Regions:
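General helical structural elements
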Residues: 6-7, 119
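Intrinsically disordered, low-complexity segments enriched in polar/charged small residues
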Residues: 7-8, 267
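Hydrophobic h-region of N-terminal signal peptides that target proteins for export
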Residues: 9-18
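Positively charged n-region of N-terminal signal peptides that target proteins for export
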Residues: 1-4
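Sequence signature of WD/YWTD-type beta-propeller architectures
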Residues: 20-299
């Protein structure tokens, strides 16, 4: 009888771990006529912005309409403001001294006007915080906050990587939290409510912790994870190949409260670098070939 009971418990446990978090309604390829990289989807899921090589930063809608927002061919770390009216990005440049400098800029999606938020610097941190239409950047460990719409600027938390350290800036103060000690931390992202940070520790996997480095929770093999709401993550799983050539990769949804996860793409597409809408119902991703896809989910 005890064996039967234990077997039933194990079966129920296995069923709960494989329970479905969402229903995949559609996985749609968006043919915009350009190759893109690392898309960022809007809060409402109606469009994405992405880097498109020589075309610069582009806006792409669900029907494939593609418009150039800014001629910034080397731009990276794209972020959208809450209202979807501006894209913030890092713009690198090389000067006559052969050193690399990075400035932080914003571009208005409607007017295409580009504004410099932080002048080119050798010490601009990789992370950016967005709160409404306020942008918080960190230069040489010091927070700099600006409003894009003339309203009072609101400072937000920022997570960034500094020589492999996981740095978190809260209330204008920056410190390395390195939750598991010295290592190589990458892919940090702060939750929408500003309470937690997800990151990848090379050789160890994906983790979530509080902004002070406490409360570490292991997520597993979830690469380049981003938030799909405050309690869920989506990232790359079952990655095969090399950094130069990915031969297989799927996307997996993970629920922090239950520990349940669900694969949301199949092996017909090499899905990488996801971005989720505010409610997690739409997830954009690209392939190594620069194809853009959007996954639509329902709970």
């Amino acid at each position: 009888m005890r064996k039967i009971f234990l077997t039933a418990v194990l079966m129920l446990g296995a069923m709960s771990m494989s329970a479905q978090l969402a229903t995949v309604q559609n996985v749609q390829r968006i043919d915009a006529g350009v190759s893109v990289d690392k898309p960022v989807i809007s809060a409402d899921g109606s469009f994405v912005v992405a880097q498109a090589g020589a075309k610069g930063i582009v806006k792409i809608t669900a029907d494939g309409t593609c418009t150039t927002v800014a001629k910034a061919s080397g731009a990276y770390n794209l972020r959208l403001t809450a209202d979807g009216q501006n894209v913030v990005f890092a713009a690198p440049e090389y000067r006559s001294n052969h050193l690399r400098y990075v400035s932080l800029k914003s571009a208005n999606l409607a007017t295409k006007s580009v504004r410099t938020l932080v002048k080119a610097s050798r010490r601009l941190n990789s992370g950016v915080g967005i709160e409404g239409n306020s942008v918080t950047a960190v230069e040489n460990g010091k927070a700099r906050v600006q409003s894009l719409d003339g309203t009072k600027a609101v400072r937000s938390a920022v997570a960034s990587i500094n020589y492999g350290h996981l740095d978190v800036t809260v209330n204008g103060k920056t410190r390395s939290i390195d939750p598991q000690g010295r290592g190589s931390y990458i892919w940090p992202s702060i939750s929408p409510d500003g309470q937690k940070v997800v990151y990848w520790l090379v050789g160890r996997g994906c983790f979530v912790c509080n902004l002070d480095g406490t409360g570490v929770q292991r997520v597993g093999e979830l690469r380049a994870a981003v938030w799909a709401g405050n309690d869920r993550l989506v990232g790359m799983d079952e990655v095969e190949g090399t950094a130069q050539q990915v031969t297989a990769s799927s996307l997996r949804l993970y629920d922090l409260a239950s520990g349940v996860s669900q694969t949301i793409t199949d092996d017909t597409v090499k899905a990488q670098f996801p971005s989720a809408s505010a409610d997690g119902s739409r997830i954009a991703f690209t392939t190594p070939e620069g194809e853009l896809y959007i996954v639509t989910l329902t709970k």
